[in-house]
Amino acid sequence: MANMTSSVSASQVAGELASATFEEIPALVEHYREDPRQQVIKACERALKRHAKELAERERVNGMYQLMHELGGDGVVVGVDEVGRGSVAGPLTVCAVCLPMEPRIWGINDSKKLTPARRELLSVKIAEVATAIGFCHIAPADIDEMGMARAIRTAVAGAVADTGLEPDCVLLDGNPLGAVP
């Protein structure tokens, strides 16, 4: 280590590691790995932990894209997610989205597993890259009249139709539906 301790403060190193991108972390940790300062050692440990967590997340998302490719091949795959469950929870809303294989959207997940802030951020990213998006809303009174199972089927079919696509495969919460609704 070439006199690193005198040229860069431990706080600066910690800040650099904290703001590093996923791609930058390995090289930065390697660069600072022999720095004996406790603050730098801890910052490297935190960065490596963050990198490992992000790597696991990217592997999960890559698995979703791989499933999408396996099920749809070169055809059209539409992912569907629903929110709301009947008159107690309000209306049922279903969104159908067709995403290209690239660019990958890291962090994409079932809406119920995301914080409101993360949902908002991802909705912007999805809107930027989606080849098609469709929605369907079912009012609470209609859900009560037709029943939840039929309301979900109706909303999924409506959202898929709203995309304007004829999908080869539809995924509901990441699971393939037996047949296109």
Show the residue positions of the predicted features.
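Acidic (Asp/Glu) carboxylate-rich active-site/surface patches
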Residues: 1-78, 82, 88-181
